[in-house]
């Protein structure tokens, strides 16, 4: 792996997906909670408090970050479907990772399971026109739901790979 920050490569560029590409990414999004949880299964507190790379977040912080990030993406999905080009709010992900609810990872893993069931149910129901709906991010600009699906599929796999790579590297 050449860059430990991006074990599966960089985030995808803005794109329009075909029906087949959407179905493939939806399957990945549906499977993510189980795969993500398996990457954290059986880890001790000391292991969870280990950064996945020098200067990076701990595995514990990654577990909470993915739940927080995907929760925000779910809300952005619903905003894009119910409002005309809504401007979404950013959040301070580094500060969220330090809040008192970030000790035990089980609640975040539970949240991810239920969240992904609901999120995938919404996404599976979309028409081609709805996939083109847009929300506006203050930093990245306009994002279609296609772009959002591609990004968050990558995001989940990206952080799962961080955990799996550290486990392999340390023999856990």
Swiss-Prot record:
Binds 1 zinc ion per subunit. Its cofactor is Zn(2+). InterPro entries: DinB-like, DinB/YfiT-like, Put_metal_dep_hydrolase_YfiT. Pfam families: DinB_2 (PF12867). One of its GO terms (cellular component) is cytoplasm. It is found in: Cytoplasm. Keywords: Cytoplasm, Hydrolase, Metal-binding, Zinc. Belongs to the metal hydrolase YfiT family. Homodimer. This is Putative metal-dependent hydrolase DR_0841.
